[in-house]
From Swiss-Prot:
It comes from the Bacteria. Its cofactor is [4Fe-4S] cluster. Its EC number is 4.2.1.33. HAMAP family: LeuC_type1. One of its GO terms (biological process) is L-leucine biosynthetic process. Keywords: 4Fe-4S, Amino-acid biosynthesis, Branched-chain amino acid biosynthesis, Iron, Iron-sulfur, Leucine biosynthesis, Lyase, Metal-binding. It is an enzyme of class 4 (lyase). This is 3-isopropylmalate dehydratase large subunit. The keyword Lyase applies. Heterodimer of LeuC and LeuD. Pathway: Amino-acid biosynthesis; L-leucine biosynthesis; L-leucine from 3-methyl-2-oxobutanoate: step 2/4.
Length: 467
């Protein structure tokens, strides 16, 4: 039916039944777990003497709390050691596939599943992590869930969910030099707001999106949640299929052609009906930097921090709170803002293409005096490939630290933290108060290339000047 969206097709294909509450009981094709949100869920199973219904549909790794510098066991942080031991025990007991540190497959959960071909078009995917929307880049419907829902998926392989509206977001045209997928999604969030997507799934399309690589599409879908959406996705196409072909868990042989035919049928029809359509032009998007305490408080690198009267009335009080917390003044340019720490990594921007772009800026440069800069590959596989390409040497020669894979400073559940009033240039996804470990630490979100430019300059600069 040409009027159906991909979201409708995937939702209907996975509907078990409509519950008396009006919610849908949805079958979950792939469940991803990690060390932080799973221990309590397994404990709840044991309390009820329940098995994991489909252990073959669950995949585990360690990412949130694991250190990125010293992995000698036991870990220096006893809580990290305890939580990882618990995940190891649970995976053994319930026979769940587990990618531990040193396996060659460990990494941030939203990096390892796509790179192994576990994430595929038409799937429903759940994980106890907000940024599960990343997997929508493949034409999957992927939800971040809480611990009690992790329990539900382990026990029943289903979730009770309310069906979402669908907003199509189109971006047309060619991105300029120094403008990346990170800038596109920050621009979208700035324009639609951090609550603009509440109750929606975002479908991304248009010539700009179609021209993006899979890793760029993952960055885009990753931050759908920062825009208030429950999930985000891109219709699968030749770019998707080329990425998946030959990967470990992708269909093989004659099954491949059959899978591609089905995946192609999932794309939203030419007459698909949407609840809303929003259109952006790529030419209007510049390298973007957040200046405040939400991902929606951002500006182009060549702009000045807005005054309250320039903002919608509903945003003015939060803006005043942001000025005070960040120590920035309305009317000041964001260029020239000094930085103390520069972090390249996270499930948003810790993939190989991200490191390549940052390395182009770092090559032949030196990290500015007084700045701590470090690179955290998104997975052991990314790290190995980056080292084969010589990226590690480029970063280390420039004075960046080269780390092991993990979530690192994105959320600071591990030793990678800001101290005091330090301000970071970060390729991660959230700039909330205290997000990076210090209750008074400050975060400026930007692309990996912009972070590298800030690291070698000691301040926010326009990356286009270094290209």
């Amino acid at each position: 039916m040409s009027e159906r969206t991909l979201f409708d097709k995937v939702w209907d294909a996975h509907t078990v039944r409509v519950l008396p509450s009006g919610q849908t009981q949805l079958f979950i094709g792939l469940h991803l777990i990690h060390e932080v949100t799973s221990p309590q869920a397994f404990a709840m199973l044991r309390e009820r003497n329940l098995p994991v219904l489909f252990p073959e549909r669950t995949v585990a790794t360690v990412d949130h709390i694991i250190p990125t510098d010293n992995r000698t066991r036991p870990f220096a942080d006893p809580l990290a050691e305890e939580m990882i031991q618990e995940l190891e025990r649970n995976c053994r007991q319930y026979r769940i596939r587990f990618y531990n540190s040193g396996s060659g497959q460990q990494g941030i959960v939203h990096v390892i599943a796509p790179e192994q071909g576990l994430t595929q078009p038409g799937m429903t995917i759940a994980c106890g992590d907000s940024h599960t929307s990343t997997h929508g880049a493949f034409g999957a419907i992927a939800f971040g869930i809480g611990t009690s829902q992790v329990r539900d998926v382990l026990a029943t392989q289903t979730l009770a969910l309310s069906k979402l509206k669908v907003r199509r977001i189109e971006v047309h045209g060619r991105l300029g030099p120094g403008v990346y997928a990170k800038d596109v999604i920050l621009h979208i969030i700035r324009k639609l707001g951090v609550k603009g997507g509440v109750g929606y799934a975002y479908e991304y399309g248009g010539s700009t999106i179609e021209a993006m690589s899979m890793e760029e599409r993952m960055t885009l879908c990753n931050m759908s949640i920062e825009g208030g959406a429950r999930c985000g996705y891109v219709n699968p196409d030749a770019v998707t299929f080329e990425y998946l072909k030959g990967r470990e868990f992708a269909p093989q042989g004659s099954d491949w052609e059959e899978a591609v035919a089905w995946w192609q049928s999932l794309a939203s029809g030419p007459d698909a009906v949407y609840d809303d359509v929003v259109v952006f032009q790529a030419a209007e998007i510049a390298p973007t930097v957040t200046w405040g305490i939400t991902p929606g408080q951002s500006i182009g690198v060549d702009e000045r921090i807005p005054a309250p009267e320039e903002l919608p009335e509903s945003e003015r009080e939060l803006a005043k709170e942001a000025y005070a917390y960040m120590g920035l003044r309305p009317g000041d340019p964001i260029v020239g803002t000094p930085v103390d720490v520069c972090f390249i990594g996270s499930c948003t921007n810790g993939r190989l293409s991200d490191l390549r772009e940052a390395a182009k800026i770092a090559k032949g440069q030196r990290v500015a005096p007084g700045v701590k800069a470090f690179v955290v590959p998104g997975s052991e596989r990314v790290k190995q490939e980056a080292e084969r390409e010589g990226l590690r040497e480029i970063f280390e020669a420039a004075g960046f630290e080269w780390r092991d894979p993990g979530c690192s400073m994105c959320l600071a559940m591990n030793p990678d933290r800001l101290v005091g009033r330090q301000i970071s240039a970060s390729s991660s996804n959230r700039n909330f108060k205290g997000r990076q470990g210090s209750p008074s630490g400050r975060t400026l979100l930007m692309s990996p290339a912009m972070v590298a430019a800030a690291a070698v300059s000691g301040k926010v600069v326009d990356v286009r000047e270094l290209l």
